[in-house]
Curated annotation (Swiss-Prot):
Cited SMART domains: HTH_ARAC (SM00342)
UniProt gene name: argR
Renumbered residue ranges of the record's region Disordered: 307-329
Database matches in SUPFAM superfamilies: Class I glutamine amidotransferase-like, Homeodomain-like
Record's GO cellular component terms: protein-DNA complex
Regions of compositional bias (Polar residues) in chain numbering: 319-329
Gene Ontology MF terms: DNA-binding transcription activator activity; DNA-binding transcription repressor activity; transcription cis-regulatory region binding
Protein name: HTH-type transcriptional regulator ArgR
Length: 329
């Protein structure tokens, strides 16, 4: 008698990117190719009306009446949906009450949290919107891990962590050997554990492994609200001020104070896009003594005031945080 495939549902919101979906789908397809008993059938369901995103159309059909067909269900989005429709919310809560395993990929954690279905659970939250998520959903145990599997809830922070979570699923269902085989099939160097960090090591971000530079930047990142002076940083890392300035100039092409200012401004921009805090609150949180001081520094670096930037960028994606500083001569 032929075994019935395990149907894994992917409930998609319009802003889902092809990468997020294809990582999950290909892991299941590779498992089926490599293991005759790894019978997975992806089922793509649309949470909202179809929409084209970046030249592609989401696969799938309307979710209505089909959630209960899934042995596991993942909510998938790459931008936080504004709200969950009452009918869909009711269906998801009923599914959760039935004991079904429900997960979320990338910003799919937002609708799951909005419904209270992550309260008291650990959830992996992408570092870009971690501040916003923790502010909005204090009952969720938000982590900065790649993925979390907490009882009947599975969450991946996004990006390649989606594949990491699916490999963990394969390992639980069919053993580590299959997960390893799928990893090799997809040319993945190694299988990462869920509790590994999301961000690459600081030395890779800086392009240098100079120990004094790394120590100084870590100090800056840990002291955003109450910035240290260059002399204080130099003292902490046991070099003279002139030595510290030479190191920064050599590796980062700027003096420590300029790098520190840019670090604080980028943190401020991230908070502007991802939290509902006032502009004054954000400025103070990032070490600026007054609103005018913050606004002036922000405009000099980004070319717009904090208010203008928040209004413009929230017209697009709430999670776009790549900065475009003003050209300097």
């Amino acid at each position: 008698m032929t075994a019935q495939p395990q149907r894994i549902g992917f409930l998609l919101w319009p802003a889902t990117r092809a990468l997020t979906l294809s990582l999950a789908e290909e892991a299941l397809r590779a498992a089926r190719r490599l293991h005759p008993e790894a019978l997975y059938e992806p089922l793509f369901l649309l949470a909202e009306a179809p929409a084209e995103e970046e030249g592609w159309r989401l696969p799938g059909t309307a979710w209505n009446g089909r959630l209960e067909q899934c042995s596991r269900l993942f909510l998938v989005a790459d931008e936080a949906p504004a709200a969950v429709s009452p009918a869909l919310g009711l269906a998801l809560k009923q599914l959760a009450r039935s004991g079904a395993a429900i997960g979320a990929l990338s910003a799919g954690i937002y609708p799951l949290a909005q419904l209270g279905l992550l309260d008291g659970y650990r959830a992996a939250v992408h570092w870009r919107w971690h501040d916003d998520f923790t502010e909005r959903f204090p009952k969720v145990i938000a982590t900065n891990h790649l993925f979390e599997w907490d009882r009947d809830r599975m969450t991946a922070c996004g990006g390649m962590a989606v594949l990491d979570l699916l490999l963990a699923l394969l390992s639980r269902d069919h053993g580590a050997e299959l997960a390893g085989a799928v990893s090799e099939e997809l040319v993945v160097e190694r299988i990462r554990e869920g509790n590994e960090r999301q961000r690459i090591p600081l030395k890779n971000r800086l392009g240098s492994s100079h120990p004094k530079l790394t120590q100084a930047v870590l100090l800056m990142e840990a002291n955003i609200e109450e910035p240290l002076t260059t002399d204080e940083i130099a003292q902490h890392v046991c070099v003279s001020r002139r030595q510290l300035e030479r190191i920064f100039k050599q590796y980062l092409n700027r003096v420590p104070s300029q790098y520190y200012l840019e670090l604080r401004l980028n943190r401020a921009r991230q908070m502007l896009m991802q939290t509902s805090k006032s502009i004054i609150q954000i400025g103070l949180s990032c070490g600026f003594s007054s609103g005018p001081h913050f606004s002036s520094a922000y405009r000099n670096f980004f070319g717009v005031t904090p208010r203008e930037d928040r209004n413009q960028r929230r017209g697009g994606s709430a999670f776009e945080t790549t900065f475009t500083p003003v050209e300097r001569g």
